[in-house]
Amino acid sequence: YAPLGWYGTNYVGLRGRMAILSEAYSHADFEKRIRVTHDFVAEILEYVAAHADDVRRIEREADRQTTLEGAGLAPRPELAVAYESASRGTEPVPLVVMRANPDTTARRRAIPTDTVRTFVLPIYDHFRATKTRGLPAGYYLPPSERAIADLLRLHGLLVERLDVDWSDSVQVFGVKEEKWADRPFQGHKLLALTGDYAPAVMRTLPAGTYFVPTAQPLGRLVFSLLEPEGYGLPRWNVFDRLLGADFGAYSGLVYGSTAVAEFPVWRAVRAPRAPRTALP
């Protein structure tokens, strides 16, 4: 399994809600998998029903804490944009000894024996960040990108539009390399961007610019979807038409910048104090 937000269990967690993955591995026969899955899910539902008040309290606190962090009323955390698997150490693990299936035409090439042996093995049970970025106050999208704003709304995110021109400090991501995957994954050649943020600069944001605040219960999801180095919308080609030869030119055209190779979503140092209207 992977820590990426596009997997359903992880996505629910990014929304500040609890999720548990249920999987029945294929080494068990079909009947056993069905029975074990039923019992596992029933046990979870019974536990949640018995602890419903605690679950609601924890999730409400997650909403509150995330909103405070985005607003700068609590320390803004460093959040992961890249990960690696990590081990809690080695432990003795009892394993059933398998033997070769004498039926070479069978689907299962190994079958279990009655022998159990214990091996000391590393237990990889979590992920750790290999690269982090600080949570910003929000993200600015070009006024022309209504389709992207609508996509964010489909995720339930608060998206606002500036009613007037506004000048403020922003962080701009300078792209050093764009690398598309050689093979498609679910119909997409995933895009990896590498680069860095320049020190905050003053930029003028025209009326109509979209602002997506992190001061909302789904603030972590905002970060996950819009950080250029992560596994969100940039990775899934949502910004591809703004990249390539016209990348810098487009960014400059929209925002009046003379810089090149700028990712066209800017990080807000603080929420704009300009009048703005929330999208329906």
Language-model features and meaning:
Residues 1-170, 174-175:
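Hard-cation-handling environments
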Residues 132, 149-213, 220:
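Substrate-recognition/cap regions that form aromatic- and gly/pro-loop-enriched pockets
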Residues 66-73, 182-189, 256-264:
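A general structural signal for short secondary-structure boundary/capping elements
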Residues 48-51, 167-170, 187-191, 238-243:
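Short, surface-exposed, polar/charged, turn-prone segments marking secondary-structure boundaries
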Residues 142-144, 214-217:
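Short, flexible beta-strand-to-coil junctions
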Residues 9-10, 14-17, 124, 165, ...:
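Surface-exposed loop/turn and secondary-structure junction residues enriched for glycine/proline
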Residues 218-222, 226-280:
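Accessory, solvent-exposed terminal regions and/or long lumenal/extracellular loops of proteins
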Residues 55-62, 174-178, 195-201, 245-254:
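Low-complexity, flexible helical/coil segments
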